[in-house]
Regions:
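Small/polar-rich, solvent-exposed N-terminal microdomains that initiate assembly or binding
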Residues: 1-52
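Compositionally biased, intrinsically disordered low-complexity segments enriched in polar/Pro/Gly
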Residues: 1, 33, 59, 122-126
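Oligomerization/assembly interface segments of phage tail-like spikes and tubes
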Residues: 59-72, 109-121
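Amphipathic alpha-helical segments
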Residues: 6-17, 81-93
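Charged low-complexity stretches with an acidic bias
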Residues: 69-83
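Acidic-leaning, charged glycine-interspersed low-complexity segments
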Residues: 82-126
Length: 126
């Protein structure tokens, strides 16, 4: 059976007590969420990429995800991203260059968006 890394990351974030009570979704922030409510959004930057080849076969996959935190409180964005970073490290993901760290006047929220790269174990089907 094929595995789904997005679901695995979502579950890891949802299971963390320090993130309880915060809306965590994939792909986009829910329209029904209040403008003043904090959210975390997991966005695949692309499909899994073949890596670690052997005998004309891909033995592992590389993944790239962007995780956005939006809040009316800049410090809360930083604290949440700090916790997310630890969770992602536990999942074998590390932050890459780029991202976003700014106040967006149109939505009246701070946004801290970071990109994480990780790899599956050998012989896992994703």
């Amino acid at each position: 059976m094929i595995k789904d890394k997005l679901t695995e990351l979502y579950k890891a974030l949802k299971e963390d007590e320090s993130l309880s009570g915060i809306s965590i979704k994939s792909f986009e922030r829910p329209d029904t969420l209040g403008d003043d409510e904090t959210s975390i959004v997991i966005i695949p930057v692309g499909p899994p990429i073949q890596t670690a080849h052997g005998s004309n076969t891909s033995l592992a996959k590389t993944f790239l995800y962007q995780i956005n935190v939006e809040s009316t409180n800049r410090v809360e964005c930083k604290e949440l991203q700090g916790r997310i970073e630890k969770i992602m490290e536990d999942q074998g993901f590390y932050q890459t260059e780029g991202g976003l760290d700014q106040w967006i006047p149109d939505i009246k929220r701070y946004v801290d968006a970071r990109t994480y790269k990780g790899r599956s174990a050998l012989y896992e089907e994703y």
